[in-house]
Regions:
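Structure-specific nucleic-acid interaction/processing domains
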Residues: 1-82
Length: 82
């Protein structure tokens, strides 16, 4: 099982679309942890450091059976919200 998720910055409304085969809660915690490390020039992590992780929330927007389907749907949702 794969999930497509959306992370929203509640200050400026900017979005990040991603996919995972773990729970979205686990994936969100990974993003938070990565933002605290030396990952530079990554827009999501830069924004989390600038605005604070408490201004971001995650929600599941789709479910996929296969990795291939998840990749296709991730592209679809990125275009949809662009």
């Amino acid at each position: 099982m794969n999930f497509i998720y959306k992370i929203t910055n509640d200050i400026n409304g900017k979005l990040y679309i991603g996919k995972t085969n773990r729970s979205i809660e686990t994936r969100f915690q990974e993003h938070i942890n990565f933002s605290k490390r030396a990952y530079k020039n990554r827009p999501l992590y830069d924004a989390m450091n600038k605005y604070g992780v408490n201004h971001f929330h995650i929600e599941q927007i789709d479910i996929c059976e296969t990795d291939e389907e998840a990749s296709t749907k991730e592209i679809y949702w990125i275009a949809y919200y662009d």
